[in-house]
Swiss-Prot record:
It comes from the Bacteria. Its main location: cytoplasm. The keyword rRNA processing applies. This is Ribosomal RNA small subunit methyltransferase J. Specifically methylates the guanosine in position 1516 of 16S rRNA. S-adenosyl-L-methionine binds at residues 109-110, 125-126, 161-162, 179. It is an enzyme of class 2 (transferase). Keywords: Cytoplasm, Methyltransferase, rRNA processing, S-adenosyl-L-methionine, Transferase. Gene3D superfamilies: Vaccinia Virus protein VP39 (3.40.50.150), YhiQ-like domain (3.40.1630.10). Belongs to the methyltransferase superfamily. RsmJ family. Its EC number is 2.1.1.242. It comes from Shewanella sp. (strain W3-18-1). The gene is rsmJ. It is found in: Cytoplasm.
């Protein structure tokens, strides 16, 4: 699979950025982000990485997508491989490596885990700022000597407003993976920071229940929904099976056997 970027036209989004930085100007133009001196968020380039800052909380670190170093790299090397709960949930097993659409990509961490285990993954992200961060993370990953080759083959980004838009793609999808934004009770510094930034940027996934039906229509084998352990079933629909983890669970809606 070639690593392509499919852009769906969206309403313009206000953002603050340095207008004297040509690369930032180009990125904002491509993603229809318009300069606004009073915008609550700023995009910057720091150490060759596109970063998002909440302007009224200057002490917070910038948010970026990093597939090469840090926590995701550690998980790729030491995270348990196909024995991980997410791998079991999507149906990874010997001789079976499904194609996956991640319908709520966010910072792309779960998509990266699945790609590192061999899945071809299409990330869907509807918010243009988050999509811009994902694109930049992919750019750096594609250039990396260790992971660049397989990243090109296994991960692509689709900027669209809904899963229904993906049904127009002429490709069969085994699994649709969903992780709708849900209020977190976890008070760790990282979760507090990222949730504060993301919830104020994109808002809550108030239409999350509406994702299940198009996901079931698109997937040929199963839909996997990641939920906090205290959350109700998506759209009130009971899953075929549940895989529990320490703080979350994977609700699996099976349509057909993995082969």
């Amino acid at each position: 699979m070639t690593a392509i970027l499919l852009v769906r036209r969206q309403p313009v989004t206000p953002i603050f950025f340095n207008q004297q930085y040509p690369t930032l100007v180009d990125i904002c133009a491509r993603w229809q982000l318009i300069y606004d001196a009073n915008a609550p968020f700023e995009l910057r380039f720091e150490s060759d990485s596109l970063t998002l800052h909440k302007r009224d909380e200057p002490k917070l670190d910038g948010i970026l997508v990093d597939f090469v170093t840090g926590a995701v790299a550690h998980r790729r090397k030491f995270g348990g491989g196909r024995g991980q709960s997410i791998a079991k949930a999507v149906g990874l097993k010997q001789g079976v490596t499904p194609s996956v659409v991640d319908g709520t990509a966010g910072l792309g961490r779960d998509a990266f885990v699945l790609a590192s285990l061999g899945c071809t993954v299409t990330m869907v992200e509807r918010h243009p700022v988050v999509a811009a961060l994902l694109e930049d993370g992919l750019r750096r990953a594609y250039q990396d000597a260790e992971i660049g080759d397989w990243m090109h083959e296994r991960m692509q980004l689709f900027h669209g407003s809904s899963l229904e838009a993906l049904s127009k793609l002429e490709q069969e999808v085994d699994v649709v993976y969903l992780d709708p934004m849900y209020p977190h009770r976890d008070k760790s510094a990282l979760v507090k920071k990222e949730m504060r930034v993301f919830q104020s940027l994109v808002g809550a996934d108030l239409d999350a229940d509406g994702l299940l039906a198009p996901a079931l229509a698109l997937a040929t084998k199963r839909v996997v929904v990641k939920r906090p352990d205290y959350a109700e079933d998506l759209d009130g629909v009971k899953p075929s099976m549940v895989i529990d983890t320490k703080k979350n669970r994977f609700d699996v809606y099976v349509k057909a056997a993995m082969k």
